[in-house]
Amino acid sequence: MANIKSAIKRIQTAERNRLRNKSYKSAVKTLTKKCLQAIEQYAAAPSADAQAEAQKYLSATYSKIDKAVKRGVYHHNTAARKKARLAKEFKQATGQVAA
């Protein structure tokens, strides 16, 4: 453990930031899994409801990724890569460009 007051504060700050970052990353991963699952369900049995569900999860995932970038959890290129991969999956399943 650090003895210097400023070092102790930095340790506390780093831990707080680590937990915040972990929360955002976990939420992005969860939404990504739900989005991919919805896309797979649409691919297996195409319907308007299934497509709307996939679009809903895609939008929610995009939003969470963008918020993580805004808060410095992800680099903007990492976020762009994640979003592009999701859009590619969506386009392959639906034949539409993700909005």
UniProtKB/Swiss-Prot annotation:
Task: Provide a GO CC annotation, any one.
Answer: small ribosomal subunit
Q: Which InterPro entries match?
A: Ribosomal_bS20 (IPR002583), Ribosomal_bS20_sf (IPR036510)
An example Gene Ontology biological process: translation
- In terms of domain of life, where is this protein from? Bacteria
| Keyword Ribosomal protein applies | yes
Recorded GO terms, molecular function? small ribosomal subunit rRNA binding; structural constituent of ribosome
In Pfam terms, one family for this protein is Ribosomal_S20p
Write the record's keywords in alphabetical order, separated by commas.
Answer: Ribonucleoprotein, Ribosomal protein, RNA-binding, rRNA-binding
Q: What is the role of the protein in this entry? A: Binds directly to 16S ribosomal RNA.
In terms of HAMAP family, this protein maps to: Ribosomal_bS20 (MF_00500)
Q: Which family does it belong to?
A: Belongs to the bacterial ribosomal protein bS20 family.
The name this protein goes by in its record:
Small ribosomal subunit protein bS20
Biological source species: Picosynechococcus sp. (strain ATCC 27264 / PCC 7002 / PR-6) (Agmenellum quadruplicatum)
